[in-house]
Amino acid sequence: MSAARKRVAVVGVGTMGSQAAWRLAARGAEVVGYDRFAPGHDRSAAGGETRIFRSAHFEDSRYVPLLKHADALWEQLQQETGRELRRLTGCLLMGPTEHQQMATVLQSIAEHDLDHEVLDAEALAKRFPQYRIEDGDAAVLDRRAGFIRPELTIQTAARRAEQLGAVIHRYTTVREIVPVANGVEIRTDAGSECFDTAVVTPGPWVNDLLPDLPWDVEIRRLVSAWFVPTTPDAWFGEERPAFIRTAPTHCYGLPSPDGISVKLGLSRALHRIAGDPNQLDRTVQPQELEIFSELIGRHMPDLHPDPTRLSVYMEGYTESSRPLVGPLPGADNVVLLAGFSGHGFKLSPAFGDIAADLALDGTSEQPIDFISTVGRTEA
């Protein structure tokens, strides 16, 4: 069956679903999307104005080819829509020279010939004085990196899909996905529709929608906090890279596009279990701010320790931190993308393209064999 004749449902038009809808529609599929809210909402993982894009990968260098594919698609989506969805300002990875993540990022840079610069502690302190450097620290500046605008990206990808013929049902919760003869049935409160295939990108609602999923996706609650610097020029000058610190406490941050504040976030280990995604606790308790105060005092003393803004989001994590990507067992026409474990947004155009491959062709030429693909267990 050709893409032009294939009818594909996209369940969840968020980070992954909006990209999948765009790539499917671009290939001529008849696309119908469903979202319990509307593209660009802040009820799950996408929000907070910025996400980091980087080319060097400190978790696993095998992601780099996917990042390169995503990079090309970011450029393509911007060109097709005329919107600035990301800005390449660089990204600093800082930490002890002996830390494993520093070794892995240098490995990924060497293997894939990535544009970068290595800074020792002296050079780092001189060039980026806003960071307090510890003995033994070094940094890698990933030049093909910067920030993404998440809400704008999702809305832009969804609108581009609609321009290409997709239909998106907003504020429409999918209650059930039922494989049927030669297709799949999507059931909502408004009724049901049948499709040839479905791409399921439910975000933190994965366990609600697929309660019998044989793999664990743990939904965690994460806090983003914004702080105003005392010396704005240090953060918002000619160089204003995003940053990641590996140790002793893993954290990340981005100078905000408005030139006023700096956003900080924490690693998975410091995120609470979210519980029911429909009842997310969005109140940030004072004790949750203590770790931010400690980080600022130790590594970024130029930031005022009282946050000017706090936001709470949800993210799905797998045990391996690798996503679930592929057809569900016993339902080859239902393609799942879930559990991106905090690393999905920068890769979302690539995974949207992979979802289109799997939905239309049943396979993808992209190098995803190392991922914990649905239907098998990664050794």
Cite the ranges covered by each PLM segment.
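Flavin (FAD/FMN) cofactor-binding and adjacent substrate-gating region
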Residues: 96-164, 169-170, 176-179
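Glycine-rich FAD pyrophosphate-binding loop
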Residues: 26-46
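N-terminal Rossmann-like FAD-binding beta1-loop-alpha1 element of flavoenzymes
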Residues: 7-33
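Dinucleotide-binding Rossmann-like beta1-alpha1 core, especially the glycine-rich loop
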Residues: 50-127, 250
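Active-site substrate-recognition segment that forms the wall
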Residues: 22-26, 84-86, 192, 197, ...
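Conserved Rossmann-like nucleotide-cofactor binding loop
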Residues: 16, 39, 205
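Predominantly flavin-linked oxidoreductase catalytic cores and closely associated redox partners
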Residues: 148-233
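C-terminal catalytic lobe of FAD-dependent flavoproteins
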Residues: 294, 298-379
